[in-house]
Amino acid sequence: MSKTAFSSPNHGERRLGPPDMIIIHYTGMETSAAARTRLCDPAAAVSAHYLIDVDGTIDQLVDEARRAWHAGVSEWDGETDINSRSIGIELVNKGAGSDYHPFPAAQMAALIDLITDIVARHDIAPKDVVGHEDIAPGRKIDPGPKFDWERLRRLGLATGPRLP
């Protein structure tokens, strides 16, 4: 698995120890360049640890030891500082718009490789690999109904989604 490093200034100290969750997002943008620009813009005050393009290219934007700013107002298992306990992965995808868009095979393969690697290094349970929609229901809808949760379940990487 090949990763390209970019540096987002939007991060801080983890407050709760090492990560024990993975949060999957979609960018809601047309291109990886547009998403990378936003995720690395200090004025935007948002970031993620990883950005995966439709061709499977993985960009690392924030070191895993740092707290990326991707979860916003959210909650999981009674904890509200999800950014401090998670690794955020953004998938380049237009999102809902007029219709949800599929996630290409190369992108899903790269995501599976990345999740497998992160889970092994941080001992993250499948129940804690979730979507943004799971930690911020009613506020967020990503990665949405076209995301292949069933594939992640079959591989033992996730148990989601939580929401219908």
Positions of the model-derived regions?
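Short coil-to-beta-strand
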Residues: 80-91
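N-terminal catalytic cores of peptidoglycan-degrading enzymes
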Residues: 1-80
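Structured loop/turn residues at beta-strand edges in well-structured enzyme cores
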Residues: 17, 84, 124
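Basic/polar, cationic surfaces and motifs that engage anionic cell-wall
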Residues: 80, 94-164
